[in-house]
Swiss-Prot record:
Disulfide bonds join C234-C237, C246-C473, C286-C294. This is Glucoamylase. Substrate binds at W144. Residues 498-533, 616-640 are annotated as: Disordered. GO terms for biological process: polysaccharide catabolic process; polysaccharide metabolic process. The keyword Hydrolase applies. The keyword Hydrolase applies. Residues 1-18 form the signal peptide. Residues 533-640 form the CBM20 domain. The active site is at D200, E203. It comes from the Eukaryota. PROSITE patterns: CBM20, GLUCOAMYLASE. One of its GO terms (molecular function) is glucan 1,4-alpha-glucosidase activity.
Length: 640
């Protein structure tokens, strides 16, 4: 078998493969490759089996393998929660091989929640606000910006997502006995401490942060619904969620979202882009109150934040207001001399992909006085009004926004390494990667942006019933319940349908049918849901190929459409061999393809000397499924 792809991920790039990757023709094909790279990299950073994090305990998500300049070899509750939410969404959309990773994470959090630390302990709940821990599940006792109050909310959201899947698939006792007690601890923390100051997600400002408040509101809303679903209740969620939403409105300045109170900075910060995308609800309208991605407030803020970086990075010189630029944390940043971050640039793209989804779902978009400047920068003829999806103006605006969004991802493509690796930052002048290598959050950001680009969205968190702002805000808190949880073992869970079991993109995890079709010796499975939903415009198609190879050989996928290189071998999509065994010589790749697209394809074998061997005729044929709720499909082939 060939370890060539794996070696590339660990930095040992083979010249032939590097040349192939460097010739990627389109953003689509790059993203198809990069999504596989990102998923593998995330798993490489999770203990105990992660290839890059030897010594990390099982289920511990390590921020980066970097141990010096800077030392990020720790686990942050915030980063871990965001990363696991990404994996949970992938799992619910069909990647069932992630089950053990999710279980190990939850088991690890049962231990982490109980660790006494400089912020406190579990008995008072205060210890849940500790930002980071050692990778061996012990307290980090050095000086740090603590507490950080976003972590418990994000961890709750990640676990609720998995808990809901358990409920939808008949594992009620597991959701009730294992997941709910851990979620309850985090919800109790949010309800008790949300109105106290803490450090922001960048660990620098001690005050009140938009990102923190936004994700806390979301957690309590979906936490209350989850409590009901497991036969319990969360009165502290119900009493505090409206008050948090009320307070959230105070971050709106009239022209942009203020990132932090108690800060001398301008307040323009990617914090607010991240807050919007991590509270995105695919069922929501363009609500200003929750700063939904398509809301006038969020769009106006997007322009203000992005524009704040146009003149301060050499990389952005000469780019017009209608062009994407490299995006950092905030314009006053001095960490590593202040540079763009991969995850911030991707957040700018993801918000726009979210907005495109919301406009498409509601069948119109609205330009208001608040959002007009955003639209005019991209479409000079924009004027206030509501535009139906059947209008030419709607089409022109949507095309401009999609191009703008893709521009941010293209910047990420430019500065990612040839093997797909992404650090924390890239230099504002020459684009070279900086700071911690292989940042786990960078890879999670790539996966979520790519999914949103392809209309693959997470489950609703209940925004539609939680967007009404109280007439008067009250600075309150509520006491919940804290309890120590020990996870000794998990029951046997069968994620039916192999790698193609999926929840609908709009929320339900109840899979009711699996259909199979065949075409030219290819077995195809797709997954659908019985609930009402939208039809995604793209489907994540996994190509599984059984092919025995020798060391130095690699397998690529080529075909008659641009996403598969238009038959150009140099633009083929590399398959991964990280699951290859002598008894099961599996090569695979997941490619996002337009729903309903019909095409021909073949696999090719590239030798160590870069010579190409085509499999035998005839060409294989495939039509991407296009149906309500169908977001994934799998094609099973054998080399011939």
């Amino acid at each position: 078998m060939s370890f060539r792809s794996l070696l590339a991920l660990s930095g040992l790039v083979c010249t032939g493969l590097a040349n192939v990757i460097s010739k990627r023709a389109t953003l689509d094909s790059w993203l198809s490759n990069e999504a596989t790279v990102a998923r593998t990299a995330i798993l490489n950073n999770i203990g105990a089996d992660g290839a890059w994090v030897s010594g990390a305990d099982s289920g511990i998500v390590v921020a980066s393998p970097s141990t010096d300049n800077p030392d990020y070899f720790y686990t942050w509750t915030r980063d871990s929660g965001l990363v696991l939410k990404t994996l949970v969404d992938l799992f619910r959309n069909g990647d069932t091989s992630l089950l053990s990773t999710i279980e190990n994470y939850i088991s690890a959090q049962a231990i982490v929640q109980g660790i006494s630390n400089p912020s406190g302990d579990l008995s008072s709940g205060a210890g849940l606000g500790e930002p980071k821990f050692n990778v061996d599940e012990t307290a980090y006792t050095g000086s740090w910006g603590r507490p950080q109050r976003d972590g418990p909310a994000l961890r709750a959201t990640a676990m609720i997502g998995f808990g809901q899947w358990l409920l939808d698939n008949g594992y009620t006792s597991t959701a009730t006995d294992i997941v709910w007690p851990l979620v309850r601890n985090d919800l109790s923390y949010v309800a008790q401490y949300w109105n106290q100051t803490g450090y922001d997600l960048w660990e620098e400002v001690n005050g009140s942060s938009f990102f923190t408040i936004a994700v806390q509101h979301r957690a309590l809303v979906e936490g209350s619904a989850f409590a009901t679903a497991v036969g319990s209740s969360c009165s502290w969620c119900d009493s505090q969620a409206p008050e948090i939403l009320c307070y959230l409105q105070s971050f709106w300045t009239g022209s942009f979202i203020l990132a932090n109170f108690d800060s001398s900075r301008s307040g323009k910060d990617a914090n607010t882009l991240l807050g919007s995308i991590h509270t995105f609800d695919p069922e929501a309208a363009c609500d200003d109150s929750t700063f939904q991605p398509c809301s006038p407030r969020a769009l106006a803020n997007h322009k203000e934040v992005v524009d704040s970086f146009r003149s301060i990075y050499t990389l952005n010189d000469g780019l017009s207001d209608s062009e994407a630029v490299a995006v950092g944390r905030y314009p006053e940043d001095t960490y590593y001399n202040g540079n763009p971050w991969f995850l911030c640039t991707l957040a700018a793209a993801e918000q726009l992909y979210d907005a495109l989804y919301q406009w498409d779902k509601q069948g119109s978009l609205e330009v208001t006085d608040v959002s007009l400047d955003f639209f005019k920068a991209l479409y000079s003829d924009a004027a206030t009004g509501t535009y139906s999806s059947s209008s030419s103006t709607y089409s022109s605006i949507v095309d401009a926004v999609k191009t703008f969004a893709d521009g941010f991802v293209s910047i990420v493509e430019t500065h990612a390494a040839s093997n797909g690796s992404m650090s924390e930052q890239y230099d504002k002048s020459d684009g070279e990667q900086l700071s911690a290598r292989d940042l786990t959050w960078s890879y999670a950001a790539l996966l979520t942006a790519n999914n949103r680009r392809n209309s693959v969205v997470p489950a609703s968190w209940g925004e539609t019933s939680a967007s009404s702002v109280p007439g008067t805000c009250a600075a309150t808190s509520a006491i919940g319940t804290y309890s120590s949880v020990t996870v000794t073992s998990w029951p046997s869970i069968v994620a039916t349908g192999g790698t193609t079991t999926t929840a609908t993109p709009t929320g339900s995890g109840s899979v009711t049918s699996t259909s199979k079709t065949t075409a030219t010796a290819s077995k195809t499975s797709t997954s659908t849901s019985s609930t009402s939903c939208t039809t995604p415009t793209a489907v994540a198609v996994t190509f599984d190929l059984t092919a025995t190879t020798t060391y130095g050989e690699n397998i690529y996928l080529v075909g008659s459409i641009s996403q598969l290189g238009d038959w150009e071998t140099s633009d083929g999509i590399a398959l991964s061999a990280d699951k290859y065994t002598s008894s099961d010589p599996l090569w695979y790749v997941t490619v996002t393809l337009p729903a309903g697209e019909s095409f021909e394809y073949k696999f090719i074998r590239i030798e160590s000397d870069d010579s190409v061997e085509w499999e035998s005729d005839p060409n294989r044929e495939y039509t991407v499924p296009q149906a309500c709720g169908t977001s994934t499909a799998t094609v099973t082939d054998t080399w011939r």
